[in-house]
């Protein structure tokens, strides 16, 4: 019964996409917008992604072409503790007998002296919430009370200029900017198992900035009717 309340038979995913493209003999463009909404086989395990992309190319003349690729991605996910730890889903689930009804996974406990303890976690080994440490966290507590979320915003921009001074020589200069902020939140309420019995809140923020520059030269030589030589040299920073 607890397994059925924690784990679905199958996950669900909904993907929506929109694309627009066009152009003429001197320019072209491509735009796409997409959204993915996904629920995992474990309840409250979610993943959401929204992404947009714009590609553009313009031919200024017979020798110079400009292009740019830009993209934005936002992801928001919540992951359930699954690995081999007493706060995770599987240990509490597999070490709970099937005849134990753990649906009331939290409640109010009264000590022998009448002291009231609200929102106490209730598990097989602490069936009336007599301790702030559940020993093995009730799996329903794991999927409903804990949080392990990640939110990421990412932007990439890749401009490029291509120059063909002659019919056999091509020069490419390409840049890349990659910006991302990654915020991860972990929350274990008071009453969890192990060292987190007193509760734990943790927030990690990563600010990522990457840039690159490539300069590439391509040359094509016709040595004879049967032999063709193509050479490529480049520099990256």
Residues covered by each model-derived region:
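Residue-level signature of outer-membrane beta-barrel architecture
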Residues: 22-24, 35, 58, 70, ...
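Surface-exposed loop/interface segments of Gram-negative outer-membrane beta-barrel transport/assembly proteins
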Residues: 1-4, 41-45, 51, 55-154, ...
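Alpha-helical support elements that line or immediately flank enzyme active sites
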Residues: 157-163, 177
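Long hydrophobic segments that form regular secondary structure
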Residues: 165-167
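Outer-membrane beta-barrel translocator/receptor signature
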Residues: 8-52, 63-64, 155
């Amino acid at each position: 019964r607890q397994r059925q309340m924690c784990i679905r038979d199958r996950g669900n995913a909904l993907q929506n996409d929109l694309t627009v493209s066009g152009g003429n003999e001197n320019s072209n463009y491509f735009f796409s917008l997409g959204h993915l909404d996904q629920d995992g086989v474990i309840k409250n395990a979610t993943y959401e992604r929204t992404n947009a992309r714009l590609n553009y190319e313009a031919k200024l003349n017979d020798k110079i072409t400009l292009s740019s690729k830009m993209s934005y991605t936002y992801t928001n996910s919540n992951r359930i503790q699954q690995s081999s730890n007493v706060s995770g889903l599987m240990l509490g689930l597999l070490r709970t007998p099937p005849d134990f009804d753990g649906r009331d996974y939290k409640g109010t406990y009264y000590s022998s002296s009448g002291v009231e303890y609200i929102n106490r976690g209730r598990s097989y080994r602490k069936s009336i919430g007599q301790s702030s440490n559940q020993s093995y966290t009730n799996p329903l507590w794991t999927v409903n009370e804990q949080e392990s979320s990640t939110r990421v915003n990412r932007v990439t921009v890749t401009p490029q200029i291509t120059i063909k001074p002659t019919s056999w020589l091509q020069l490419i200069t390409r840049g890349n900017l990659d910006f991302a902020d990654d915020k991860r939140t972990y929350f274990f309420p008071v009453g969890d198992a192990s060292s987190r019995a007193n509760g734990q809140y943790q927030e990690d923020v990563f600010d990522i900035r990457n840039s690159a520059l490539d300069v590439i030269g391509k040359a094509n030589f016709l040595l004879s009717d049967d032999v063709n030589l193509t050479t490529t040299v480049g520099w990256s920073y």
